[in-house]
């Protein structure tokens, strides 16, 4: 069986609303379990690949501040 994790995760959220996506992200973060990290990574990858340079710069600034805390 050839399991493509990225495809599976994207398939599972393909028809989700903005609110459902937010709930998925918030729930994964609140649970704090490492098993959710790949899914969050795939979602971040989707955000990153669809962001323009200004949006990427804003994300990087936010990330830089967050990791310094």
UniProtKB/Swiss-Prot annotation:
It comes from the Bacteria. Induction: Expressed only in the forespore compartment of sporulating cells. It is found in: Spore core. Its main location: other. Keywords: Sporulation. The keyword Chloroplast does not apply. One of its GO terms (biological process) is sporulation resulting in formation of a cellular spore. It holds the Pfam family SSPI. The keyword Chaperone does not apply. HAMAP family: SspI (MF_00669). Belongs to the SspI family. This is Small, acid-soluble spore protein I. It comes from Geobacillus kaustophilus (strain HTA426). The lineage of its organism: Bacteria, Bacillati, Bacillota, Bacilli, Bacillales.
């Amino acid at each position: 069986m050839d399991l493509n994790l990225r495809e599976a995760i994207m398939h599972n959220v393909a028809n989700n609303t903005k609110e459902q996506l937010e709930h998925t992200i918030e729930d994964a973060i609140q649970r704090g379990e490492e098993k959710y990290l790949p899914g969050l990574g795939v979602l971040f990858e989707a955000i990153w690949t669809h962001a323009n340079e200004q949006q990427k710069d804003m994300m990087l600034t936010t990330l830089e501040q967050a990791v310094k805390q």
